[in-house]
Structure formats: C-alpha cells, structure tokens
From Swiss-Prot:
Keyword Signal appears in the UniProt entry: yes
Protein name, per record: U18-hexatoxin-Hi1a
Range of residues in the leader sequence: 1-17
Gene Ontology MF annotations: ion channel regulator activity; toxin activity
Disulphide linkage map: C48-C63, C55-C69, C62-C81, C71-C79
Function comment: Weak insecticidal toxin with probable ion channel impairing activity. In vivo, induces paralysis when injected into sheep blowflies (L.cuprina). Shows weak toxicity, since it is only toxic at high doses, and flies recover within 24 hours.
This protein's domain notes: The presence of a 'disulfide through disulfide knot' structurally defines this protein as a knottin.
Lineage: Eukaryota, Metazoa, Ecdysozoa, Arthropoda, Chelicerata
Organism the protein comes from: Hadronyche infensa (Fraser island funnel-web spider)
C-alpha cells in the first residue's frame, strides 16, 4: 500500500510541474522571467517561430519542423529551438 501511495504522489508532483510550466503568465511577468532565464543563450539557439514563446518537444510546428527543440529537463523547462536538424 505504501508503494502505491508513493507512486501516486510522484505522479501528481510530475503532473503539477508540467502544468505549472505550461500555465500562461501575464506578459510583463513572462518577459521578466524570460530575460532572467536567458543567461545561457548562445548563437546556436533561437526563439520559436510562430505564436508560441517557448518550444515543446511534442509539437514539431513550434520549431518549424526542421529545427530541434531542447529543454533543460528533457521535455520541459527553458525550452529553446536549436538550428540542428532533427534526426530521423
């Protein structure tokens, strides 16, 4: 019973982290947070194309299909579009 409780708790924590990351923020707060998180920006990375401000590894259209989406935590967190073509 204890293992099931830990599994459910860990799933809920993961789900809440994804929801918090994808939640819409006011534009002023988002731009402030965006400028703080850009300290590691380099010339090989760029902003997403289209209406989205951040890329998503599950949405190829965000990076125009031929660019690769890289995130700090694999699928979320400070996602950036890379100029490297996707493999496969």
């Amino acid at each position: 019973m204890r293992i099931y409780s830990l599994l459910i708790l860990s799933f809920l924590l993961l789900a809440s982290a994804v929801l918090i990351n994808s939640a819409e923020m006011p534009r002023s707060e988002k731009s402030l947070l965006y400028s703080i998180m850009q300290g590691r920006e380099d010339s090989e990375e760029g902003r997403c194309l289209g209406p989205m401000d951040e890329c998503n590894v599950f949405d190829d259209n965000c990076c125009a299909g031929w660019l690769k989406c890289n995130c700090d935590w694999g699928f979320a967190g400070n996602c950036r579009c890379s100029k490297t073509p996707k493999e496969g």
